Amino acid sequence: MDWSDPASIDIILNQLAIAYGQATDNYAVDTCHAAITQTSSVADTAVGADWVAAIYEGARQISLNTNYLPTHMFVTPGSWAALASSVDDQNRPVFPFVGAPNLMGQNAAGNAAANTWNGNPLGLVLVVDKNAPGSFMGHAAGPAAGFEFYEQQKGAISVDVPATLGRTIAFRGYAASFMADATKFVKFV
């Protein structure tokens, strides 16, 4: 580090922080997904009515067991593509890109766009995560959230290694998760 360009060290630290963030994201989504026992079937992911039925069935299960409704829908990039491109029996998008030319959003059960992961299928906040092992929805916001994730980033740490006249650099932090109530979540299968 004594002879390193500060800009190159900054690049390395940024890459370590990104790797740390991906690892904690993967931990959180895997832990949440593994604890969910309720399921709702999407018969055909290309059929809009099947998505609508699965989302409402999941909402029914969550409401029946907890008296809450889902707030978020977590999907893989593959499920996001299937959901956003699903059509009704008239070949109209179920979740259209609002504001597109010649598309007034009639029949809109939410919206989606190919240039953003933002969307709101049936009013749910859409979260697209490549680390998700599968798609699910749940009551994930507010004081009664069913799943909690805590993280404290400690940042970079370095240790001199005299034997090699070098220095080891790492990025560290603490992460913990807690499934407070698995009945507030439903997996899509």
Residue locations for each model-derived region?
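Extended hydrophobic packing segments that form well-structured cores
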Residues: 164-189
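Extended oligomerization regions of viral-like shell subunits
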Residues: 40-173
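Short loop/turn segments at secondary-structure transitions that flank enzyme active sites
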Residues: 22, 26, 79-81, 175-177
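Flexible, active-site-adjacent loop/turn segments at secondary-structure boundaries
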Residues: 1, 27, 34, 93, ...
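Alpha-helical scaffold segments that mediate packing/assembly in large oligomeric complexes
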Residues: 1-66, 187-189
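Short intrinsically disordered coil segments
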Residues: 9-10, 88-90, 141, 183-189
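Short helix/loop capping segments that flank catalytic or ligand/cofactor-binding pockets
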Residues: 4, 82-85, 178-180
